[in-house]
Structures are given as C-alpha cells and as structure tokens.
C-alpha cells in the first residue's frame, strides 16, 4: 500500500503540477520506464492514477474549486445541445458553454485539455514500458491503449469539427509517445485513425476488468470503438464491433432490468450494463462541485440545469416510460392545471433570458384549452401535429401545444403546478442521473459508455445501411426495457423513417449523458433551442455555427503556436 501510494502521488503530482504548461514544455522525464520498473505493480498504480485524476479537483491557473475533468466534460459535451434548459444566468463557466460564449481562457476549456493530455502522457509511459509479448502485461497495456484512445476522442469531439465535416480539417495534437516533439494539430482523419487503432488494440489485449466498471474491459473498448465508427460513418465496422462485443448474446440480456433501471445511475459502477464509468467512492463526494450539483438541489446542489421543453414533450408521449424516473418536477401540491407559455426573446437581444408566462388553464370541458394573458385577453391553445399525426388525449403522443400570444407563436406546456425557481418563472424540474449513489444526492459514478448506447449505435448503423428490421430490433430492446410500446416496420407510430425513430430513441435513452450535441453536429442537424431559459433563443445550425467546437486554450496556443479555431 505504501508503494502504491508513492506511485499515485508521483503520477498525480506529475499530472497536476503543471497547470500552466503546454504540450511542448511538458517534462517527459518526471515519470519514466526506470521508475516503473522499480516495482512489478508500477504500471497498475499509474493506470489507477489515470482513473483517479478524472474525478479529482485539480488546480488550473490557481483555481481548483469545482475544477473536475468529469464535471467539465459533461458541461462541454452536453450543454450546447437542445436537451437542457439553463434556468438562469450563472457565474459557473457552464454558462458560456450553454450560451455559445466560450473563450480560450475558461477554466473548463483549459482544464479538460490539460488533464486529457496528462492522462495520455501517463498511458504512453505504460505503453513504452511494458513488454506486450508477455501475457501478464496484456490487461494493463489494454487499459493504457483504451484510455489513450478515449482521451484523444474527447479532445477530438470537443476541439475539432466532426469527422463527417471532412478528414482534412484541423484536429488535435496526437501524442503517441513520451518523447518531446513540436506540437502540431494533426488532421481529423489521422486522429480518428489513431483512436481506432488504440481501441482495437485495447479490445485485443483486455479481457474482464480488474474490478468494477471503473476499470475498462474488452467490451468497453469495443463499445467506444462502435461509437467512433458511427461518428466516422463506417457503419459495417460499427455493427461488427457491437456484434463482437455481444458475442452471440441477446441484446436485451446486457441491459439493466426494467424493475431496477430507476436505480441504475446510482449503482452504475456495479451494474452489468455499465462498460466504463468514472468510479467514485463515498470519500469522493464533491458536494456543490460535483457533476450532480448542476442538475439537482436536494439541500446542497445548485440545481440550475433542467430538461428542455421539447425533450419533455418527447418523454411525455409515454408517461409510463421508466426513464421519466430520472426527471423530478418540483410539484407545489396546489390544485389545478397551469399553462406555461414560453415568451420568445426579442430580435434586438436574442441572448437575453427568455422566460415563461405562467397562469391557470381554462378548460371548457370539450377539449378546448385557453388562458388569460397578462393583457387581460383570452388566448386559445392549439394542438399542433408532430411527426405527421395528432392523437387525442390521453394517448396523445405526437403533438405539442402552441398559442399565438401577443403576436408571437409561443410554445406552451400544460402541467400540474410546479414550483418556480426563486426570482424566475422557470419551473424547477431536476435531473437525477448523477445522484444518489449510496443515497448521497451529490454522488455518482458518471457513465462514459454503457450497453444502452452501444445497442443504439448498432441501431443507427443498421438503419443507415438500410436494414430497418435489425435497427428496430435494437431500438425495441431499449423500448421494452423502458416499458413502452415497440415499433414494427408497418407501424412507426407517426415517424417518416427508421432513422428518425433511432435518433429520437437516442435522445430519450442517452439524455444528459454527453451524446445529443455530438449526434446533432455529426449529422449536420439543427438544434432548436427556442424554449425558455438563459440559453440563446435560436436554432443552432452546426454547418454555420463556428462555436460548435471549443477554442484551443490560451495557455496552449500562445506558447506552442498551434492554430486557434475559427471564431476565437
């Protein structure tokens, strides 16, 4: 234990002690093969340090509070999308990610870059030290290749354009050795090719994990590899990776059962569904600096991030959907229905917070709804078709409510009375996917890859290859677990095609897990953010919005001279 502590201290001290460094000046002699070879378990201790640093608060330019890689990763990967509502302005740098107001000096932008490359350096040390011809080294080498591939993937998806925008676009610097070298931004295609090679080698080297899901395994490497192939539009390869991971097992056999799925994220590190997570222990509770604090209050959290209205409409097509157990509306208990009308932002200030007008519902008993506006006039509520079909209540899965309110087309929601955030007119609807491990509202082991995603990777790949039957088979495994009706080729329940079915199922199943923003960008699909909140009231077109990629951190590009991303 004393030896392990020494190695962890060296590893973490090395990674975190250079908060102002850039890739050119990072010292390559702090931890080397000679040090590793002093102890047979040296590589194991170093890999444990790689996992630990992803959850620890780290110093970046003198600031450590709330500065966790995993927290920042979910801010940067999830908050620019259309699944979240930012309930108000905040001083947390999550605001800039949500509002497309990123700068190269933000701590989340700089910390994630710094920590990712420190982890990559550590994995390179292990890879250069261990003899891969020795069977006893295979597992740890596989872990090192896995983490190197995963870190490069995180960097490539955040700081470079999607692969689907072109292989020759500027990617991120590739680091495949500990040798000092001039920093250049490799093309996107080269970066993805290296990620594939690393994950393939990881899958070949690893077997079962060394412990809980906080340690990667063969299936974790194949799962992330299927994601990478999907992003690269290599659909046959994506399918092959998923089928290799399944190894003949039925897709639904890999999922957490319906009965226990509401507790899945609280128990992620021991669930059979989790392929890799950032494992946390009780001692890792970060309180208000935790990932969960962004989504939940429960006495301690900030609870500033709520589900978006369009996503709520999608869930509410099937109120029995077990996935709604992760959504916690703060009902007031007052009788009667309320109308929540989104007031569009003004053309002169689209960045200003856009709010809801909240009032009581008027129901004439004949299925006609209306409300009284702040001007004293009564406004009719229109049921608008979605996916080509409007259905009557209570089934009603394919409609939204709208109203022409004071000359504006406004999205309307009807619900029981929900407590509003203090000082604002945004209903408080918390999210619990990052909470309640060991009963602690601020503790979880955030999931990086799970079978639910992997099956939907295969579903999308099959659909894009024209194999609708197989695509629906995988989608239906997810929907059956959710406890909601499945699809057939003859009944897509209002959808025009199976691709749209898959994309909405990905949105429902993987909400707030860091996938939706990437899914929309790689497919060049618009994100409609015209709903209440502090995020800009606009449609984000990934083909036109430069800020779908983050800036290269200031302390990197100003020293190494690598090219900054456009728009910064």
Feature annotation, model-predicted:
Residues 239-446, 451, 499, 549-552, ...:
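Hydrophobic-face positions in mid-chain alpha helices that act as interaction patches
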Residues 87-158, 186-190, 203-208, 345, ...:
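Conserved, well-structured interaction surfaces
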Residues 1-29:
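Bacterial Sec-dependent N-terminal signal peptides
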Residues 21-73, 486, 530-568:
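Membrane-proximal, proline-rich intrinsically disordered regions
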Residues 279-281, 287-293, 300-302, 441, ...:
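Long, intrinsically disordered, low-complexity segments
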Residues 33-34, 62-81, 162-168, 212-292, ...:
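Short, surface-exposed recognition loops and adjoining beta-strand edges that mediate ligand/DNA contacts
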């Amino acid at each position: 234990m004393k030896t392990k502590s020494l190695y962890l201290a060296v590893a973490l001290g090395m990674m975190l002690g250079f908060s102002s460094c850039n890739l050119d000046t990072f010292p390559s002699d702090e931890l080397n093969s000679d040090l590793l070879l002093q102890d047979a378990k040296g590589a194991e201790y170093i890999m444990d340090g790689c996992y630990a640093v992803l959850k620890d608060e780290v110093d970046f330019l003198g600031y450590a509070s709330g500065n966790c890689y995993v927290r920042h990763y979910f801010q940067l990967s999830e908050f620019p999308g259309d699944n979240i509502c930012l309930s108000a302005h905040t001083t947390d740098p999550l605001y800039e990610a949500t509002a497309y107001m990123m700068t190269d000096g933000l701590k989340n932008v700089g910390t994630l870059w710094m920590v990712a490359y420190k982890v990559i350096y550590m994995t390179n040390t292990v890879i250069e030290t261990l003899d891969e011809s020795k069977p006893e080294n295979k597992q740890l080498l596989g872990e090192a290749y896995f983490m190197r591939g995963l870190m490069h993937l995180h960097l490539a998806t955040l700081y470079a354009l999607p692969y689907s925008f072109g292989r020759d676009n500027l990617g991120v610097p590739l680091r495949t050795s500990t040798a000092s070298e001039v920093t250049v931004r490799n093309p996107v295609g080269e970066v993805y090719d290296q990620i594939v090679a690393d994950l393939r080698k990881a899958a070949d080297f690893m077997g079962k994990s060394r412990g809980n899901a906080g340690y990667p395994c063969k299936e974790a490497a194949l799962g992330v590899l299927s994601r990478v192939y999907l992003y690269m539009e290599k659909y046959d390869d994506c399918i092959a990776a998923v089928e290799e991971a399944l190894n003949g097992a039925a897709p639904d056999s890999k999922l957490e059962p319906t009965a226990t799925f509401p507790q899945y994220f609280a128990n992620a590190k021991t669930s059979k569904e989790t392929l890799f997570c950032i494992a946390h222990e009780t001692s890792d509770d970060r309180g208000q600096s935790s990932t969960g604090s962004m989504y939940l209050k429960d006495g301690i959290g900030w609870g500033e991030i709520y589900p978006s209205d369009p996503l709520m409409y999608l869930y509410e097509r099937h109120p029995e959907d077990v996935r709604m157990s992760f959504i916690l509306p703060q009902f007031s208990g007052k009788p009667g229905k309320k109308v929540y009308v989104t007031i569009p932002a003004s053309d002169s200030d689209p960045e200003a917070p856009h709010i809801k007008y909240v009032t009581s519902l008027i129901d004439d008993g004949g299925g006609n709804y209306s409300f009284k506006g702040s001007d004293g006039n009564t406004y009719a509520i229109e049921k608008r078709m979605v996916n080509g079909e409007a259905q009557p209540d209570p089934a009603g899965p394919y409609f939204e409510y709208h109203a022409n309110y004071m000359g504006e087309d406004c999205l309307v929601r009807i619900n029981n009375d929900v407590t509003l955030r203090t000082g604002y007119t945004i209903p408080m609807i918390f999210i619990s996917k990052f909470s309640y491990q060991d009963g602690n509202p601020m503790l979880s082991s955030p999931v990086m890859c799970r079978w639910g995603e992997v099956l939907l990777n295969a579903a999308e790949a099959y659909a894009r290859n024209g194999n609708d039957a197989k695509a629906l088979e995988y989608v239906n495994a997810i929907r059956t677990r959710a406890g909601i009706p499945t699809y057939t080729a003859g009944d897509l329940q209002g959808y025009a095609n199976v691709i749209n079915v898959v994309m909405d199922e990905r949105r429902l199943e993987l909400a707030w897990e860091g996938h939706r923003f990437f899914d929309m960008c790689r497919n060049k699909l618009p994100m409609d953010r015209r709903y209440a909140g502090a995020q800009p009231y606009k449609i984000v077109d990934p083909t036109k919005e430069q800020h779908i990629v983050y800036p290269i951190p200031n302390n990197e590009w100003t020293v190494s001279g690598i090219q900054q991303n456009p728009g910064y």
